[in-house]
Amino acid sequence: MGKKYFGTDGVRGQTNSFPMTAENALRLGMAAGRYFVRHTGRHSVVIGKDTRLSGYMIESALVAGFTSVGMDVFQFGPLPTPAVALMTRSLRADLGVMITASHNPYHDNGMKLFGPDGRKLDDKAELEIEALMDGSLVDGLAAPSDLGRAKRVDDAQARYVEIVKSSFPRAQRLSNLRLVVDCANGAGYKVAPAALWELGADVIPIGVEPNGFNVNEECGSTAPARLSKEVIKYRADLGIALDGDGDRVVLCDEKGRVIDGDQILGLLAGHWQDIGELRHPAIVSTVMSNLGLEQYLAGRGIALERTRVGDRYVSERMRETGINLGGEASGHIVMPDYSPTGDGLIAALQVLRVLGDSGKRASELLKVFKPAPQLLENVRVPRGRKPLESEAVKAAIAEAEVRMGVAGRLVVRASGTEPVVRVMAEGEQKLIRSVVDDVRGAIETVAQG
């Protein structure tokens, strides 16, 4: 059964359009509240958000929904997604909600939900909440004397900074390191520079002037060109770029070269194996991770388990198998020993830990493997259109897979967070260009028809 409101990473869409309306946020608060209010006593939910203007509207609607069914609400204000997950667990809340559209532009927004363990809800829970949203919610309203209360938590950012610092070895400091950190004008704009500075680094912050409209605008992990320039300009040792909600990271070495999540996974897997912290000879990533990573890991006797795209699915596989390292090429790095969900800042600190242990420059360590030639294109489609169900598109994909043979890979998937179809091919350079062009053309023809 397909989902109506939830995608691969919560509910997401353009503000004031389905499903991201104030009415749906209100109904989600009421429905999720009913789902988690299953026994007597007080119940609570924590809410954080990034820096989008629409966050105020969505937050107000959620608060009204939760309090109407008897849940107390703790409001954090701007705070990274992983902080909300951690604080859900720390405050013994029934539920956590992060208001964000992650790496999307300001005009989009979304709602990510976390259970009491700080982990994202599974498909079953999301489907049950959707059913409640579409039903009558009147029966779940609290009596006037049992309404929930809303309270702002002023020290949430300071609490998270302490949690982040505790993930870094106490005997190690970042003294003598100059770091440029790009916070994408997003949720990490205060906490990321603060944590790095308190650990002793010389911090040059950029992307720390949010105005409600500039989140992810030519900055952050999806647009690292500025970070690269600033690293070279200030002769920094490392550049760190977060996305709008702080759950993913890409890096930049001292020469300005961008390092993606696959390279970070390769570095950490090898280092953790060497020091005995890799619990199993395997890590988890998605179908989008580069073939070069898989080959590098195989050379070290480490298996790469692939899942569908989405850090939630990576986390689920890790829980099933007991694997303690996983992530995505986009920069979600999942380390359950430190955080129940992807945390860009903690991942960056793990890389800095390796740099400190090795005494080497970032450029010497962070090109772990030679990536296989890869081409990824996003084909925009009108909302509601499903070109991948077209026989013409299916035929184009089948023909492309035959042409790729066993020497390459082709992945075609609809995004769960944006109205695009992603077409990714790996293999010989000229072949993947031709294959992607053909598949893209078939999708565009159907989408525009």
Swiss-Prot record:
Keywords: Isomerase, Magnesium, Metal-binding, Phosphoprotein. Its EC number is 5.4.2.10. The modification Phosphoserine is found at residue 102. One of its GO terms (biological process) is UDP-N-acetylglucosamine biosynthetic process. The keyword GTP-binding does not apply. Mg(2+) binds at residues 102, 243, 245, 247. The keyword Phosphoprotein applies. It is an enzyme of class 5 (isomerase). GO terms for cellular component: cytosol. Its cofactor is Mg(2+). The active site is at residue 102. NCBIfam families: glmM (TIGR01455), PRK10887.1 (NF008139). Belongs to the phosphohexose mutase family. This is Phosphoglucosamine mutase. It comes from Maricaulis maris (strain MCS10).
